[in-house]
Amino acid sequence: MNRQLKEIGAIPITTSIIESLYPELKSADKKVVWLEKNGYIIRLKRGLYVVNPEYSGKTLSNELIANHLYAPSYISMSTALRYYGLIPEAVYTHQSMTLKHSRSFQTPIGNYDYKYIARDAFSVGVRSMHKGEYAFLIASPEKAL
């Protein structure tokens, strides 16, 4: 029954996607609660989940999660600099820029911090990076500074 979840892999999914995977169920909320309680999915925030990597066999991407957790957004600041290997320090909070209000999230996967940036500066110097089977948005090294 959970073969569909394994196929999703590391991509964050919403409650409505889970509903579409199990159309035979009348109450998707109960299915979500059951999947979470039994460790098949991990809740990032209300309505957004990832398949547990122990179950899917796929490594989770903090970059991809950051892009989905508070969209529109892209990886920036020290997180981007660390991704490019420009700073030696470990990054414990994944930093991103967003068009929305600044906000922080603490999830079982990690901590995510979003800072507001004006619309006219948002897309300048942002690139799409491919990593394995997925892609995410990240600031160029120059913009991340």
Locate predicted features.
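Nucleic-acid-binding surface
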Residues: 52-144
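Short beta-edge/loop segments at beta->alpha junctions of small alpha/beta modules
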Residues: 1-72, 108
